[in-house]
């Protein structure tokens, strides 16, 4: 026979079975959710969630984030913004209206002048154009449209 009884056997006949008479082994003894992170659950939070509590650094109240945000695209990549079919259709029919390439709609604000354009007119819409880009677009008979 074992010399020690298990706790459950010892507690037979005792009404509350070791769980007290008020709480009666119910509800949320440690609090709900993240309760006690700075107090009775501190060890767990420090070990598994370091840096969860507290502040770091100073706050800038009127910070304007990235005012110089200006994605760019070069002339040699400009025709990738419209489909190849569109380019071929307008290359055949040079008398009709020139295709419009909206760089801002594609997420680019400024058009830069690297590369060459095919010899067909095109209307380019953007917020900014470099001097060379504007010259090259106009040299193939196109136009630059500034948009806000």
From Swiss-Prot:
Comp. bias regions, Basic residues: 1-30
Cellular component GO terms held in the UniProt record: cytosolic large ribosomal subunit
Gene3D superfamilies linked to this entry: 3.100.10.10, 4.10.990.10
Spans annotated as Disordered: 1-38
Main location: cytoplasm
Keywords: Cytoplasm, Ribonucleoprotein, Ribosomal protein
Pfam families from the UniProt entry: Ribosomal_L27A
InterPro entries per UniProt: Rbsml_uL15_N, Ribosomal_uL15, Ribosomal_uL15/eL18, Ribosomal_uL15/eL18_sf, Ribosomal_uL15_CS
Disulfide bonds: none
Domain of life: Eukaryota
GO molecular function terms noted in the UniProt entry: structural constituent of ribosome
Transmembrane regions listed in the UniProt entry: none
PANTHER family reported for this sequence: 60S RIBOSOMAL PROTEIN L27A, LARGE RIBOSOMAL SUBUNIT PROTEIN UL15
Protein family (similarity comment): Belongs to the universal ribosomal protein uL15 family.
Function text: Component of the large ribosomal subunit. The ribosome is a large ribonucleoprotein complex responsible for the synthesis of proteins in the cell.
Subunit organization: Component of the large ribosomal subunit.
Protein name: Large ribosomal subunit protein uL15
């Amino acid at each position: 026979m074992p010399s020690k009884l298990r706790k459950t056997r010892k507690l037979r006949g005792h009404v509350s079975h070791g769980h007290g008479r008020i709480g009666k082994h119910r509800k949320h003894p440690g609090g709900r959710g993240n309760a006690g992170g700075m107090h009775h659950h501190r060890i767990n939070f420090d070990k598994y969630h370091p840096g969860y509590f507290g502040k770091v650094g100073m706050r800038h109240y009127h910070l304007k984030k990235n005012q110089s945000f200006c994605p760019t695209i070069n002339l040699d990549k400009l025709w990738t913004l419209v489909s190849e079919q569109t380019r071929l259709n307008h290359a055949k029919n040079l008398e009709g209206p020139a295709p419009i390439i909206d760089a801002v709609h594609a997420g680019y604000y400024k058009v830069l002048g690297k590369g060459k354009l095919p010899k067909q007119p095109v209307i380019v819409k953007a917020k900014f154009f470099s001097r060379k880009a504007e010259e090259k677009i106009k040299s193939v008979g196109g136009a630059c449209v500034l948009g806000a």
